[in-house]
Amino acid sequence: MEPIKNMPRLCRTLGYEFNDQSLLEHALTHRSASSKHNERLEFLGDSILSIIISDALFHQFPKATEGDLSRMRATLVCGKMLAEIGFEFKLGDYLNLGPGELKSGGFRRESIIADAVEAIIGAVYIDSGVEKCRCLVLSWYESRLAIIQPVNQKDPKTLLQELLQGFKKPLPVYKVIDIKGEAHAQTFTVECYVEELSKPVIGIASSRRKAEQLAAADALELMKR
């Protein structure tokens, strides 16, 4: 695995200095670049992020229902939001990608950026424990937590379905067109077919659910144009 450049600058951007910098390098390494890739860290970070955001919402909204809390959490931890955070950090400049992913523009792909954010969260947890990880994640989410409310927090698939129903159009159809990797570290490619769009919209992520949500989010953006 090749060293990743400008680590000090990235650490300043993240707001965290790693005790073991190899953890950060590991978190930024895509499966296309090395057998020692970031998918296990991503798995860990996904779970930790969910706990941190769940806890924050639980205390911030003492009167919110379980459904409201779940929808707000889904909004805050979805691939679209994680990619937004990753782009703010300019993570694409630091990713370790294989030649094929570099050529296809993987450093701009939302799913790869989102997965790297989760992997960094997992790396911080291993490096410093849950409390420092919690403080860091909450600093990333401070402005987002400040504006979120327990209303209209619907995931992209639900919003797309409701939009099409409002126009009395057929519901979207999701189809898995490719699954790569071993059972514990798979990448799913999903096509979303919407009658109003000239061609299917594609979502790529580490689970079918995430890939469908990414495809639905992109379909929504296209429908708004």
Curated annotation (Swiss-Prot):
Chief subcellular location: cytoplasm
Molecular function in Gene Ontology: double-stranded RNA binding; metal ion binding; ribonuclease III activity; rRNA binding
Domain RNase III positions: 7-129
Enzyme Commission number(s): 3.1.26.3
Ranges of residues in domain DRBM: 155-225
Gene3D superfamilies registered for this protein in UniProt: 3.30.160.20, Ribonuclease III domain
Reactions that this protein is recorded to catalyse: Endonucleolytic cleavage to 5'-phosphomonoester
Swiss-Prot/TrEMBL GO biological process terms: mRNA processing; regulation of gene expression; rRNA processing; tRNA processing
Cofactor: Mg(2+)
Catalytic machinery residues: 46, 118
InterPro entries linked to this entry: dsRBD_dom, RNase_III, RNase_III_dom, RNase_III_sf
Keywords noted in UniProt: Cytoplasm, Endonuclease, Hydrolase, Magnesium, Metal-binding, mRNA processing, Nuclease, RNA-binding, rRNA processing, rRNA-binding, tRNA processing
PANTHER family xrefs: RIBONUCLEASE 3, RIBONUCLEASE III
Stated name of the protein: Ribonuclease 3
Gene encoding the protein: rnc
